[in-house]
A protein has these predicted regions:
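Structured beta-strand-rich core segments of catalytic domains in phosphoester-bond hydrolases
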Residues: 32-102
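Catalytic metal-binding/acid-base residues of hydrolase active sites
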Residues: 9, 33, 68, 99-101, ...
């Protein structure tokens, strides 16, 4: 199963079309329009979570209809995380689509991610799992209190559950020492960050 995660900053239909042309089975799309504001080919379906007054900036999950994707029972809204079970490509898998967001929220990005990891621990422990998306988190993050949870705590929690970062596993790089940024603050090449991750037990 091919999975693509891509932040669709200032989402447009042309961006969606470009991403879908990459021919993945499942897409995790932070900063995505809600389903009502984009057009999808009939072979695709979509889930979305976000704020009703900010429909151009939520978390979208798009998949080919040969897969079965559904939100877990009793889903608790954590901004913005979508916990889904995926069937149709071998054995069932649990995927926690992730875009921790502090819009109208008093918690920090790592705090939200850590909350989701604990909330969905039942599924992380029982299914082949992936936590994937734009985490809005990095090592030594400013404005984050240790008492509330840091990204280092999030990494430790995922590793404790057998989730490993695919990027770091493949490159051998250390967290906080990534050579390939995934984001440039204000499009400034002198302000690189590594914010996008895929942690997996698969």
């Amino acid at each position: 199963m091919k999975i693509i995660s891509y932040n669709t900053y200032k989402c447009t239909q042309s961006k969606i079309d470009h991403i879908l042309a990459m021919d993945a089975d499942l897409y995790i799309l932070p900063e995505c329009f809600s389903k009502e504001h984009i057009s999808l080919h009939e072979e695709y379906d979509m889930l979305w979570c976000g704020d009703d007054d900010l429909t151009e900036k939520g978390l979208g999950v798009i998949w080919k209809k040969n897969l079965s994707v559904h939100v877990i029972p009793g889903y608790k809204k954590i901004k913005h995380m979508l916990p889904v079970i995926v069937n149709g490509s071998g054995f069932p898998k649990f995927i926690l689509a992730s875009w921790p967001t502090v819009w109208k929220e008093k918690k920090t990005y790592p705090q939200l991610l850590l909350e989701a990891l604990n909330e969905y621990s039942f599924y992380l422990d029982r299914f082949p799992s992936m936590v994937v998306g734009d985490f809005n988190c990095y090592i030594g993050q400013n404005g984050v209190r240790k008492s509330k949870g840091t990204f280092e705590d999030c990494i430790a929690e995922m590793e404790r559950r057998g989730l490993r970062s695919l990027y770091h596993e493949q490159t051998g790089e250390m967290f906080g020492e990534e050579k390939t940024p995934t984001f440039y603050w204000q499009f400034n090449q002198d302000k690189p960050f590594f914010l996008d991750y895929a942690f997996s037990t698969m």
